[in-house]
């Protein structure tokens, strides 16, 4: 596994981050396809054995049970100073309403730390932009979380570049803790972040940690082939349904490049993303150990410029999706 420094922080992270939405009690939350604890623990253990030290979860994943499962596994399989743990706040969980008010942030971080069984998280991220709370209130509350030692850093996820620029400017103006990561929607078939968000992150030294790097499984198999999860994944359908025809052309080229390299589609799609400027660690998901082993090898795969061009050329502008 390769490692790099995460943006303007002192955190040394693996070039891949394990996304933990897959882990959670199926009876809790709105994802019936998640893995219960007994199935999640072997994957988390194998992740650590494979060199990944970066884990991303959220308060709302499976109504908090993702944090519980991940926290117990990391306590059993690793020392706290060996891992980098990120979680999120915004979405509704339990009786905590959706939003980023001061009260919601301060309660959410305490609840997350309790579920994780940790004294602090390395990164607390805002999951989405809150249109009902003044951004100054949100940013000051996040700063207070850092000052209290409950989070070492703060990050953001999926928003308009203009919103992110506004937040960064306010943090500078007030001397508040800055956002150090942007978790955005970025993969071979969704590259809208290249227009404004990625240049902003480069300029500000913000590390990019993309979600859905394999387009929720669409870049791992022949186009049109389905799985039980794809059939039941309403979020994925909303993200990619409108661009299906154009995306199929990219998937065909991905298959060709993969065959030429003797690699899998997933490995090539990840290698492409890892090669992009500013991308610190794509957030991968795995529901089986063999899936994880396949993805671990992607960071050692180097694409030639002509192969990158082959993959990128068919791309056409997409509707902005993943946030409002």
Task: Locate predicted features.
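Beta/alpha (TIM)-barrel catalytic core signal, keyed to glycine-rich beta->alpha loops juxtaposed to Asp/Glu
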Residues: 133-313
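N-terminal binding-site loop/beta-alpha segment at the start of enzyme catalytic domains
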Residues: 1-83
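Active-site beta-loop-alpha junctions enriched in small/polar residues
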Residues: 21-23, 58-60, 88-92, 126-129, ...
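Active-site groove signature of glycoside hydrolases
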Residues: 113-133
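Short acidic capping loops at alpha-helix termini that bridge into adjacent secondary structure
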Residues: 14-15, 80-83, 87, 119-123, ...
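Active-site mouth loops of central-metabolism enzymes
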Residues: 24-38, 92-106, 127, 132
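Acidic (Asp/Glu)-rich catalytic clusters
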Residues: 73-82, 113-117, 146, 168-174
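Short, acidic/polar
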Residues: 33-47, 100-116, 164-169
């Amino acid at each position: 596994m390769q490692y790099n420094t995460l943006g303007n922080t002192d955190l040394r992270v693996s070039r891949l981050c394990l996304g933990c939405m897959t882990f959670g009690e199926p009876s809790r939350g709105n994802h019936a396809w998640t893995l219960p604890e007994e199935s999640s623990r072997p994957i988390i253990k194998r992740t650590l054995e494979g060199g990944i030290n970066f884990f991303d979860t959220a308060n709302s994943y499976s109504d908090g049970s993702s944090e519980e499962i991940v926290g117990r596994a990391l306590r059993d399989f690793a020392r706290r100073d060996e891992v980098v743990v990120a979680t999120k706040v915004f979405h509704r969980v339990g009786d905590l309403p959706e939003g980023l008010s001061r009260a919601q942030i301060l309660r959410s971080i305490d609840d997350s730390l309790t579920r994780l069984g940790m004294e602090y998280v390395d990164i607390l991220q805002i999951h989405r932009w809150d249109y009902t709370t003044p951004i100054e209130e949100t940013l000051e509350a996040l700063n207070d979380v850092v000052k209290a030692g409950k989070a070492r850093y703060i990050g953001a996820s999926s928003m308009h570049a203009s919103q992110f620029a506004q937040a960064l400017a306010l943090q500078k103006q007030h001397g508040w803790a800055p956002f150090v990561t942007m978790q955005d929607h970025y993969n071979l078939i969704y590259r809208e972040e290249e227009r404004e968000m990625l240049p902003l992150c480069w300029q500000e030294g913000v590390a990019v940690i993309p979600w859905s790097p394999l387009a929720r499984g669409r870049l791992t198999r022949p186009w049109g082939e389905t799985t039980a999860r794809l059939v039941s994944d309403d979020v994925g359908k909303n993200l990619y349904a409108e661009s299906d025809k154009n995306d199929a052309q990219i998937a065909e080229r991905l298959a060709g490049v993969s065959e030429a390299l003797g690699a899998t589609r997933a490995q090539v799609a990840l290698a492409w993303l890892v090669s992009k400027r500013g991308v610190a660690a794509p957030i991968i998901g795995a529901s089986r150990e063999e899936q994880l082993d396949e993805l671990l090898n992607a960071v050692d795969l180097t694409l030639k410029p002509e192969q990158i061009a082959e993959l990128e050329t068919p791309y056409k502008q997409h509707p902005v999706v993943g946030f409002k």
